[in-house]
Amino acid sequence: MKIAILSRNPRLYSTRRLVEAGEQLGHEVDVIDTMHCYMDITSSNPSVRYDGKPLPKYDAVIPRIGASVTFYGTAVVRQFEMMGTYSINESVAISRSRDKLRSLQLMSRKGLGLPKTGFAHHPDKIGDLLKNVGGAPVVIKLLEGTQGIGVVLAESNKTAESIIEAFMGLKANILVQEYIKEAGGADIRCLVVGGKVIAAMKRQGAEGEFRSNLHRGGTASLIRLSPEERRTAVEAAKVMGLNMCGVDILRSNNGPLIMEVNSSPGLEGIESATGKDVASMIIKHIEKTAFLSSTKTKGKG
């Protein structure tokens, strides 16, 4: 097979591992900088152009699109879909998962476990917003934040009100969520591929840090999932329409609660923690599905 990885940096661990795994399994793998692609939209023969010429026909693409370039990145993926190329994650599913609010609304509609969550832009009654999620301590998030940036823990209602007022001054959209104390600053990252959890790790926040992101000094270790946690992760991926994703879950007194679904999960932490060759599992899934044309929304929306 001929596979393209859409990535802005071929030296990133996840990109390198996917190239290695693809080549070891006998495939031709190219890394293409998403932002350097440009497209011929209106011709009867749609194409993606790169470095002054049309890209060759690929059997599959693996989008590794950063949050900051979601709009352009998904446009490139959509163009590949219009050309009949299989994408492990479709453009519409990536866009859906990048909208944190829409993701939460979709998962809530399906009855999946979520922390109590409020959404606001310029609330006229901040106290009522806090009361609706159970009061302090609360976690306040910028809707557009990634990797733990723009996430604040407010220990008291007074602190929470001050933070929300500051975000209001920035004209920002914010999420306010109940703080799950029993999680102890840890979460679980489940890697779902093809409707199955293929690997899982526990991420523990650094001392005194409630955010468990590895980018923020958190540590990763192997973990055994409960059947309910496994089901929750698989269902979250299904609701988002993602064939490959990282589902972040908190262990709470009310069962597993979903924090986020990531359409471009990093591989370094989970391969190190589990010892699994996750990259090869992803390529093998593509081998099984690329020619089935089983994607439901190809080239639409």
UniProtKB/Swiss-Prot annotation:
Mg(2+) 2 binds at E260, N262. Binds 2 magnesium or manganese ions per subunit. ATP binds at K141, E178, Y179, D187, R211, S212, N213. Coiled coil: none annotated. Residues 104-287 form the ATP-grasp domain. Mn(2+) 1 binds at D248, E260. HAMAP family: RimK. This is Probable alpha-L-glutamate ligase. The gene is rimK.
